[in-house]
From Swiss-Prot:
Family: Belongs to the FAH family.
Pathway of action: Amino-acid degradation; L-phenylalanine degradation; acetoacetate and fumarate from L-phenylalanine: step 6/6
Binding residue positions for Ca(2+): 139, 212, 214, 246
EC number: 3.7.1.2
Binding, substrate: 155, 253, 363
Residues at the active site: 146 (proton acceptor)
Keyword Magnesium: yes
Cofactor field: Ca(2+); Mg(2+)
InterPro entries hit by this protein: Fumarylacetoacetase, Fumarylacetoacetase-like_C, Fumarylacetoacetase_C_sf, Fumarylacetoacetase_N, Fumarylacetoacetase_N_sf
Name the UniProt record assigns to this protein: Fumarylacetoacetase
Binding site for Mg(2+): 246, 266, 270
Pfam families linked to this entry: FAA_hydrolase, FAA_hydrolase_N
Single GO molecular function: metal ion binding
Length: 429
């Protein structure tokens, strides 16, 4: 039976009602077993309930019978890059096979206790790793609400959004080497800040450390150098999405940005969630994308102009508090430029994308105050405070843990992303 928002699929693996990872999801990641007598290499997996399904073990057991995966070594690799490069036919074959062997009425894994124990690893026994080797990382700037607010803060109300913003998806080249997996601590960065009066620029730990609520798209096959990807073929090159926190040092960023854009204010750390939710799993949650005025140029005009209804939340847990507090709620559907428009624009000059490349949406702010996706907007660059439990914040303090989460609500099930977390540590001496 075809999947949909009313899918009757059930797994023999017990999945709690509120779980992010039912059989309708099956996001891909890479893990290492904790506590093994001998160090084990990283292994690809999908999440199902509170378990990681070891895809190397599934492959070794001969459970992939399809023409593309039966003889492929892609799930014996330490990252997902080889699998990503195989393209949508292989992704669909993998998803269909995994949903079949995990379904409640399929005995091949359900009734084989030894194989089941080998393949299903409790999440509590796993160390989640960065699931891909990120060759290149591009950060876009695609929320009109975020663009407008930043313009007001830094340039005033006259022209808060530059005219080119409505003509093309604005982006910049990020730093792939500092993309890290959820749970990795963040050392407060040092850099130059804006001079005050006649003084020289300030140098030291950032005084305006911020989070940015974003999502990152992971590239599949990609394209040859010099050969752009057509807008209406772009979805074939997007494997899935991860939650992303584009940590930002606003004082460093503000001083360095003119004329070439962000550098040290962004490049110190970018955190992503460990599970990649596939576009196939997100298909039931498509929604109409915002109307674009003026109409985009022909190379950005797509037949299927859609976004995804993905609710997102930001929580902060101060060091002195036992529980986190929610500080923002937004939604992916507010994105002005779609993922496919971002990818088509990225390649229109002939730039080649490769399997495992990553491009991010920019801060996913919405129209309401509660939907602003960073402290820069929530505090209007530190001009006001927000409540965080029984504390207040203008920017992040040492010991703060930032928790991003996202989850789509289907009919009787969720398709979630888990969490994307990081704790701020003091700057080095």
């Amino acid at each position: 039976m075809a999947e949909g928002s009313r899918s009757p699929l059930r797994s023999f693996v017990e999945v709690a009602p509120g779980s992010h990872f039912p059989i309708q999801n099956l996001p891909f990641g890479v893990f290492r077993r904790r506590g093994s007598p001998e160090p084990e290499p990283p292994r690809p997996a999908v999440a199902i309930g509170d378990f990681a399904l070891d895809l190397a073990a599934v492959s070794d057991a001969g459970l992939f019978h399809g023409p593309l995966l039966s003889a492929s070594p892609c799930f014996r690799q330490e990252t997902l890059n080889m699998f990503l490069g195989m393209g949508r036919p292989a992704w669909k074959e993998a998803r269909a096979t995994l949903q079949k062997i995990l379904s409640a009425d399929e005995p091949v894994l359900r009734d084989n206790e030894a194989l089941k124990k080998k393949c299903l690893v409790p999440m509590s026994d796993t160390e989640m790793l960065l699931p891909i080797t990120v060759g290149d990382y591009t950060d876009f700037f695609c929320s009109v609400h975020h663009a407008r607010n930043c313009g007001f803060i830094f340039r005033g109300p006259q022209t808060p959004v530059n005219p080119n913003w409505f003509q093309l998806p604005v982006g910049y080249h990020g730093r792939a080497s500092s993309v890290i997996v959820s749970g990795t601590d963040i050392i407060r960065p040092k850099g130059q800040g804006h001079p005050t009066g006649d003084s020289r620029p300030y140098f030291g730990p950032s005084k305006k450390l911020d989070f940015e609520l974003e999502m990152a798209a992971i590239v599949g096959p990609g394209n040859e150098l010099g050969k752009p990807i057509d807008i209406n073929d772009a979805e074939e090159h997007i494997f899935g999405l991860m939650i992303m926190n584009d940590w930002s040092a606003r004082d460093i960023q503000a001083w360095e940005t003119i004329p070439l854009g962000p550098f040290l204010g962004k490049s110190f750390s970018t955190t992503v969630s460990p599970w990649i939710v596939t576009m196939d799993a997100l298909k039931p949650f498509t929604c109409e994308a915002p109307k674009q005025e003026p109409e985009p140029l022909p190379y950005l005009a797509e037949k299927n102009h859609v976004n995804y209804d993905i609710p997102l939340e930001v929580w902060i847990k101060p060091k002195e508090q036992s529980e986190p507090s929610m500080v923002a709620k937004s939604n992916f559907k507010h994105l002005y430029w779609t993922l496919t428009q971002q990818l088509a624009h990225h390649t229109v000059n002939g730039c080649n994308l490769r399997p495992g490349d990553m491009f991010a949406t920019g801060t996913l702010s919405g129209p309401e105050t509660e939907s602003l996706g960073c402290l820069l907007e929530l505090t209007w660059n530190g001009q006001k405070e927000i409540s965080v439990g029984n504390s207040t914040r203008k920017f992040l303090e040492d010991g703060d843990e930032v928790i991003l989460t996202a989850c789509c609500k289907g009919e009787g099930y969720n398709v979630g992303f888990g969490t994307c977390t990081g704790k701020v540590l003091p700057a080095l001496p």
